[in-house]
């Protein structure tokens, strides 16, 4: 109980998440911990099972029998079937899950939270303080004009410094090997760590689904659908055997030096809760897995498609208002927008933004909305036009001229060869 209480206080929404992350590390963890606490309270505050004992049993004997049966398992027999004669047959039909259910759920909740710990530990080594920058963006969202400009400047300066650092710095820390593996020097460290975290989320939900099936002794991966179908059709557990409410229990007591064996019938009130809880978890694990899978595919498409990358940044440039920089150079701005806009936009999006910066912008956009991101991208666009636009356009003209010269040279050589051939 203390462990679950401390986990409840530790699990909080984070500012460095996207899409389905919160569904995994936050909502799943809290939901499963809540279920674990519910079953724990039912087990240790109420009566987990009650047994029908022989009339000669005293109150102490009855309590002993119920405690023994709760600890050492029960076995299920269909109402119209005979009780198995051999111990081996009875053991093969044992119900071994109900007393362990709250502990298994606590472990499941912990495993849903582990991936975000992995993400938190490695993402902080990138040089980009994502949480701090998102907090700054949130301050800018609700600030007045001057304070807003100041907060936006802080974010833009941090991004620019990170871009310069990635180009010029050779990593020499203890994390250097891990950072190289995850693409630190190419501005892909956060992106790769984040995608690995997504993979861990999916692996976790799939393994949770598989291990829960094994824990319940179900060899059919569709058992959840069968139970749901039984509930909807009104099929009684007495016929299906799913989470039986009544089970048998065998125990021995020593009376006057002799061992006497008793077989008693017990009511498993816990299984009323277990049936609904594990059916919910069956559906939940599948839902989380597929939602995370589709979200990861969608993210990869948006991150590694040049078209979607340009489209992502273009939406903010389209939203931005004309600032003082536009008013100072209206003619130049107009030329850029009409004639060379595609060249500059392509250079700006594909070469001035690393995947890590794109992930950062997506997280800022996720927690603050379009307005702050519009100002950040707009500010960086205007700085790009001031500092790099002429150089980019000149390089494009030079390359174009070089290609024309090369094409003319090839044509001349071809004509010369044709003339030689004719002669």
UniProtKB/Swiss-Prot annotation:
InterPro entries referenced in this protein's UniProt entry, alphabetically: Innexin (IPR000990)
Top-rank lineage group of the source organism: Eukaryota
Intracellular or extracellular location(s): Cell membrane; Cell junction, Gap junction
Keyword Metal-binding recorded: no
One Gene Ontology term of the molecular function aspect: gap junction channel activity
Assigned keywords, A-Z: Cell junction, Cell membrane, Gap junction, Ion channel, Ion transport, Membrane, Transmembrane, Transmembrane helix, Transport
Cellular-component GO terms for this entry: gap junction; plasma membrane
Main location: membrane
Topological type in the membrane: Multi-pass membrane protein
Tissue: Expressed in pharyngeal muscles.
PANTHER family linked: INNEXIN (PTHR11893), INNEXIN EAT-5 (PTHR11893:SF21)
Function according to Swiss-Prot or TrEMBL: Structural component of the gap junctions. Required for synchronized pharyngeal muscle contractions.
Family: Belongs to the pannexin family.
Full protein name: Innexin eat-5
Protein's organism: Caenorhabditis elegans
Gene transcribed to yield this protein: eat-5
């Amino acid at each position: 109980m203390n462990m679950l209480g401390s986990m409840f206080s530790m699990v909080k929404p984070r500012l460095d998440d996207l899409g389905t992350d919160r569904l995994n590390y936050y909502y799943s963890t809290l939901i499963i911990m809540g279920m674990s606490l519910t079953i724990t309270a039912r087990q240790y505050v109420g009566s987990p099972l009650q047994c029908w004992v022989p009339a000669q049993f005293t109150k102490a004997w009855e309590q002993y029998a119920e405690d023994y049966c709760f600890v050492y398992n029960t076995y299920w027999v269909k109402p119209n079937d005979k009780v198995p004669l051999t111990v081996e047959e009875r053991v093969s039909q044992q119900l071994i899950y109900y007393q362990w259910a709250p502990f298994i759920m606590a472990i499941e909740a912990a495993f849903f939270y582990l991936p975000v710990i992995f993400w938190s530990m490695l993402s902080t080594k990138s040089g980009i303080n994502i949480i701090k920058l998102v907090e700054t963006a949130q301050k800018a969202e609700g600030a007045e004009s001057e304070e807003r400009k100041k907060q936006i400047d802080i974010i833009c300066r941090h991004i620019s410094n990170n871009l310069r650092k990635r180009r010029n710095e050779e990593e020499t820390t203890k994390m250097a090997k891990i950072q190289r593996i995850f693409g630190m020097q190419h501005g892909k460290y956060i992106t790769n760590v984040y995608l690995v975290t997504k993979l861990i989320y999916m692996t976790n939900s799939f393994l949770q689904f598989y291990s829960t099936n094994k824990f319940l002794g179900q060899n059919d991966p569709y058992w959840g659908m069968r139970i749901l179908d039984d509930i909807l059709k009104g099929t009684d557990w007495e016929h299906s055997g799913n989470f039986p409410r009544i089970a048998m229990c065998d125990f021995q007591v020593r009376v006057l030096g002799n061992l006497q064996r008793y077989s008693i019938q017990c009511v498993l009130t816990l299984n009323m809760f277990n049936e609904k809880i594990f059916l919910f978890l069956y559906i939940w694990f599948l839902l989380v897995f597929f939602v995370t899978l589709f979200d990861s595919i969608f993210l990869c498409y948006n991150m590694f498609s040049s078209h979607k990358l340009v489209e992502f940044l273009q939406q903010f440039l389209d939203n931005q208002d004309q600032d003082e920089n536009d008013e100072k150079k209206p003619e130049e701005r107009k030329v850029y927008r009409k004639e060379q806009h595609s060249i500059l936009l392509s250079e700006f999006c594909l070469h001035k933004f690393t995947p890590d910066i794109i992930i950062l912008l997506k997280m800022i956009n996720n927690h603050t909305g379009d307005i702050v991101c519009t100002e950040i991208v707009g500010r960086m666009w205007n700085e790009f036009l001031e500092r790099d636009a002429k150089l980019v356009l000149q390089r494009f003209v030079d390359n174009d001229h070089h290609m024309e010269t090369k094409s003319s040279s090839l044509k001349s050589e071809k004509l010369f060869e044709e003339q030689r051939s004719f002669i």
